[in-house]
Amino acid sequence: MSYTYLITGATSDVGRALIERLLQNAPADTLVLAQGCGDLEKLADLCARFPGQVRPFDVDLSDRAKVDTFVQVLASSAPAPTHFIHL
């Protein structure tokens, strides 16, 4: 079974450490949908280390319209999350 993690606050120190821990020994089909807000460069090293397994999204979760767009993008371009982690 493949796992898809949706992690909000993924650009935080805890978020980045969690992504690294999740993907270190994970099967290649494990996917992390990583939400940040204006600071996605913090995920660049993880995207490089785990190519194709980290998909960053720049979304301001305090803006309802942006959240709606984010949900639509996820629904059309990613598998449904099996896990949701809000940091």
Task: Briefly describe each language-model feature range.
Residues S2-T4:
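Extreme N-terminal starter segment of soluble prokaryotic enzymes
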Residues L6, L33, F57:
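Conserved Rossmann-like nucleotide-binding pocket used by diverse enzymes
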Residues T8, P81-L87:
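Rossmann-fold scaffold of SDR-type NAD(P)-dependent oxidoreductases
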Residues T11, G15-E20:
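N-terminal Rossmann NAD(P)H-binding glycine-rich loop of SDR-like oxidoreductase domains
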Residues E20-Q24, Q72:
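Short, well-ordered alpha-helices that flank and scaffold nucleotide-derived cofactor binding pockets
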Residues L23-L43:
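Conserved glycine-rich Rossmann-like NAD(P)H-binding loop of the short-chain dehydrogenase/reductase
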Residues C47-A65:
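Rossmann-fold cofactor-recognition segment
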Residues S62-S77:
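Conserved Rossmann-fold cofactor-binding substructure of NAD(P)-dependent oxidoreductases
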